[in-house]
Amino acid sequence: MTKVKMETKNLNLWYGEKQALFDINLPIYENKITALIGPSGCGKSTFLRCLNRLNDLIPNVRIEGEVLLDGKNIYDKDVDVYELRKRVGMVFQKPNPFAMSIYDNVAFGPRIHGIKDKKELDKIVEWALKKAALWDEVKDELHKNALSLSGGQQQRLCIARAIAVKPEVLLMDEPTSALDPISTLKIEELMVELAKDYTIVVVTHNMQQASRVSDYTAFFLMGKLIEFGETEQIFLNPQKKETDDYISGRFG
């Protein structure tokens, strides 16, 4: 039986007066890739940001309902948000390495969390870059500025930076939309590999990508979760007309 790692219960979100999410109930299974699909503005990125409370940073956002991580509501008053974001990491749409060396990018999180020992940091940096399939390309130039890397390399560096603090869940918001096809393929292969160790939730506009890499797919429309299921079922035998229309390209 696949374990539920995270789960949302009756999750509603407002930006000021405008409601953006409506009663979202969604399980996220451990060591699986869950893809969130739907047309622009349907709420999938807003939903993703609820999973590590990044919406807290936006003024006038109000949230009702629960987001459970291992059964505990991450919106409870006693939750340390920094600790939460260590457990639930994020990779953004546009590669956003810090303007510092490749090494310092990866060591950034571990240092914040108190690791000072050079040997230990060296180990973490090598481990994370290997996990992100970047080590062989950069091992001889770790002190080079990260901004000099190609777009695809920068995104793999951002993945290495995210996993360096050993998160349990990795959120990815359209991680390949700014990349060329070859870099995209590398990131997709990497996601499948990382799912052996992490629970991954990915927002994607690319339907082929969702069908290639994910185990489960959730289809959002106008702030509502229309359908959720195993990816193969959603793509080959959707139960809802709206899902079928979107997947077959009749709208979106």
Swiss-Prot record:
Domain ABC transporter: residue ranges: 6-247
Matching InterPro entries: AAA+_ATPase (IPR003593), ABC_transporter-like_ATP-bd (IPR003439), ABC_transporter-like_CS (IPR017871), P-loop_NTPase (IPR027417), PstB-like (IPR005670)
CDD domains: ABC_PstB_phosphate_transporter
GO cellular component terms given for this protein: plasma membrane
Catalytic activity, EC: 7.3.2.1
Molecular function terms from GO: ATP binding; ATP hydrolysis activity; ATPase-coupled phosphate ion transmembrane transporter activity
Main localisation: membrane
Gene Ontology BP term (one): phosphate ion transmembrane transport
Keyword ATP-binding belongs to the record: yes
PANTHER family noted in UniProt: ABC TRANSPORTER I FAMILY MEMBER 17
Family per record: Belongs to the ABC transporter superfamily. Phosphate importer (TC 3.A.1.7) family.
Protein name: Phosphate import ATP-binding protein PstB
Gene source species: Methanocaldococcus jannaschii (strain ATCC 43067 / DSM 2661 / JAL-1 / JCM 10045 / NBRC 100440) (Methanococcus jannaschii)
Taxonomic lineage from the root: Archaea, Methanobacteriati, Methanobacteriota, Methanomada group, Methanococci
